[in-house]
């Protein structure tokens, strides 16, 4: 639903998550059924092109050249439209932590969570929805995919949590920059990703965010430490924070008891801090 108060007002606390989604998104008469397209028509000319850009990103085409190829538009024109969508707060530009804004690894994502949900689940299923197949859309398209969708949403919540803690000086470092990192690990020659990384110039904080139904295991911590070695040069101290929807295994809890460089944050802690 994003953070728009009017959208949040559509939520009925007496209904289940499934019931709320079906009522607010999956009927042709739903309040949010055409909201994304209506907003685009109000804000931009050629809403069809802008919509195609957002659809491409929602489908996994996140680099500028991928987007322009997908929608069949000139790359310069496409970048102009992407910039406008960024200015509107619908999209955002992202580069791997520590790299320049002009990096060739730059990608674009959907910032507005209502747009992100709409283009992932409503736009692509409009034909089904318009034939009254809302239950099928929920069971076959949304429910099996929702944990994957929530991954990036959870990362954003975790970053907001760290920013709040950092502002109050409640972390082991007082970082001046935070972000996400992806790229090639020179040691393994494989593609790696670190969900959250922050530093204050000499000390680093590395984070992993898991929106899963099972407890986070010790293997996740070991993998995070291995990936963090990419930043071993000029690094004085390292700290690790693990975020988990479903808590932690006993092995992780035992590790934390003997290592104060590891922080654990579960869903209850995140909810308390919101």
Task: Name each model feature, range by range.
Residues 1-39:
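Amphipathic alpha-helical "lid/sensor" segments that cap RecA-like P-loop NTPase cores
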Residues 35-46, 66:
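Short amphipathic alpha-helical boundary/capping segments
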Residues 47-58, 159:
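Hydrophobic residues on short alpha-helical segments
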Residues 60-70:
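Short acidic, hydrophobic short linear motifs in intrinsically disordered regions
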Residues 71-88:
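Short amphipathic alpha-helical interaction segments
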Residues 86-98:
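A short, conserved structural fragment
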Residues 95-107:
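Short, Lys/Arg-rich nucleic-acid/phosphate-binding segment
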Residues 106-274:
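A cross-kingdom feature that marks ATP-driven nucleic-acid transaction machinery
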């Amino acid at each position: 639903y994003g953070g728009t108060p009017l959208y949040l007002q559509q939520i009925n606390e007496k209904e289940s998550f499934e019931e709320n989604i079906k009522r607010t998104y999956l009927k042709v008469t739903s309040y949010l059924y055409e909201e994304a397209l209506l907003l685009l028509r109000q804000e931009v000319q050629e809403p069809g092109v802008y919509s195609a850009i957002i659809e491409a990103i929602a489908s996994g085409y996140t680099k500028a050249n991928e987007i322009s190829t997908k929608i069949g538009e000139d790359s310069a024109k496409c970048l102009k439209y992407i910039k406008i969508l960024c200015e509107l707060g619908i999209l955002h530009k992202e580069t791997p932590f520590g790299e320049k804004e002009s990096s060739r690894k730059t990608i674009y994502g959907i910032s507005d969570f209502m747009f992100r949900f709409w283009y992932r689940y409503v736009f692509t299923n409009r034909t089904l929805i318009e034939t009254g197949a809302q239950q099928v859309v929920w069971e076959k398209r949304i429910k099996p995919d929702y944990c994957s969708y929530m991954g990036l949403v959870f990362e954003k919540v975790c970053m907001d949590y760290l920013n709040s803690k950092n502002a109050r000086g409640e972390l082991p470092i007082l970082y001046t920059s935070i972000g996400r990192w992806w790229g090639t690990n020179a040691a393994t020659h494989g593609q790696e990703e670190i969900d959250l990384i922050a530093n204050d110039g000499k000390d680093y904080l590395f984070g992993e965010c898991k929106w899963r139904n099972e407890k986070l295991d010790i293997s996740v911590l070991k993998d995070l430490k291995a990936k963090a070695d990419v930043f071993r040069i000029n690094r004085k101290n390292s700290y690790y924070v693990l975020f988990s929807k479903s808590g932690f295994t006993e092995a992780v809890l035992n590790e934390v008891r003997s290592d104060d460089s590891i922080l654990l944050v579960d869903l209850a802690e995140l909810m308390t801090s919101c």
